[in-house]
Amino acid sequence: MALVTQARTLGKYFLLLDNMLVVLGFFVVFPLISIRFVEQLGWAGVIVGFALGLRQLVQQGLGIFGGAIADRFGAKPMIITGMLLRALGFALMALADKPWILWLSCILSALGGTLFDPPRTALVIKLTRPYERGRFYSLLLMQDSAGAVIGALIGSWLLLYDFHLVCWVGAGIFVLAAIFNAWLLPAYRISTTRTPIKEGLKRVILDKRFVQYVLTLTGYFVLSVQVMLMFPIVVNEIAGTPSAVKWMYAIEALLSLTLLYPIARWSEKHFRLEQRLMAGLFLMSISMFPVGITHSLHAIFLIITLFYLGTITAEPARETLSASLADPRARGSYMGFSRLGLAFGGAIGYTGGGWMYDIGKQLELPELPWFLLGSIGFITLYALHRQFNRKKIETAMLTP
């Protein structure tokens, strides 16, 4: 028993270090894509939004297949291959001088994420006990925030010299992460049985409760992905310099490092998971409406603070709820399918956000995209409320 506990502990330390590399490599590049191609090169927002949405749709939409393959063959080969594919995508992005090259680089990056993301998420479930899972997700999210601000700082600094450097550094970090996994990650199996690919896919698709929950979250992700597209654009417009974007991620890091874990610990004692998810979504939705009429950098940072408070309230609950509902016989398949809401939400949020940004500029109605985003948030909130109240999920499944 002591050996099992030691293995779990070492595994969790490995996950934390691995997660830092993945987050750092991602945020060196992706927050700066909209600034590089929209603000610096003058491309239409819908072109860049389509690229980001395509990456989201491919990665998360195909995640169920990546998870099912990992159920069959184990986590390690999928993770290593996926990280090398993402590195290749970032290297190609450095050469993007036409939209199709940017789109292709995003597809390669997405296919990499399709392979490594579901098994990494399933490893979290495998290596954590149910009662500690919510807190471990909180630690990962705190780390995500720290990695985001460090990555954005590095990327913003490199962008002052050359966007090629931004992409090459991001690619190098993912190559390093692949080597790290090849060297240290044991050949874990992520499910309790060696589930055939077809059986794992069938098991999750027939779970109507889980499918409905995942698809309802599409609207949640339409809002959450705006930290990669619309928020950086509006901060850059108000500040007049792309270097201001790093302060947006600094706010997220500060809030996460100081409040995320205490909020998670306090709220898990007083509220159910679905209540925490809906409270966070409410804050995210209400923060959208004033963005388009704000012209002060301090005011926009206050609004972003409110948005991030919603995110750090909702995210640990959302992740824990998804894990609670997963069948342990097909963890990879379930965790892959759980990304489908992010796939649809990302595709709609990025492409639709870029299109609404262009339309708002043409009509001289900068508040239009933000009003529509806020409305989507409240529609999603209503849908979640109906879902949780029409058919209660078992209490045991809703407690971390």
Curated annotation (Swiss-Prot):
Localization in the cell: Cell inner membrane
Q: Residue span of the signal peptide, if any?
A: none
Q: Which Pfam families match?
A: MFS_1 (PF07690)
Bilayer topology term? Multi-pass membrane protein
Q: Which family does it belong to?
A: Belongs to the major facilitator superfamily. DHA1 family. MdtH (TC 2.A.1.2.21) subfamily.
- The UniProt entry's coiled-coil ranges are none
Q: Which residues cross the membrane?
A: 13-33, 34-54, 99-116, 139-159, 165-185, 214-234, 244-264, 289-309, 340-360, 365-385
Please provide, in alphabetical order, the Gene Ontology terms of the cellular component aspect for this entry: plasma membrane
Going by the UniProt record, its keywords in alphabetical order are: Cell inner membrane, Cell membrane, Membrane, Transmembrane, Transmembrane helix, Transport
Question: InterPro entries given for it?
Answer: MFS, MFS_dom, MFS_trans_sf, MFS_Transporters, Multidrug-R_MdtH
Any GO molecular function: transmembrane transporter activity
What protein name is recorded for this chain? Multidrug resistance protein MdtH
Q: Which organism is it from?
A: Proteus mirabilis (strain HI4320)
Q: Which domain of life is it from?
A: Bacteria
Matches recorded under HAMAP family: MFS_MdtH (MF_01529)
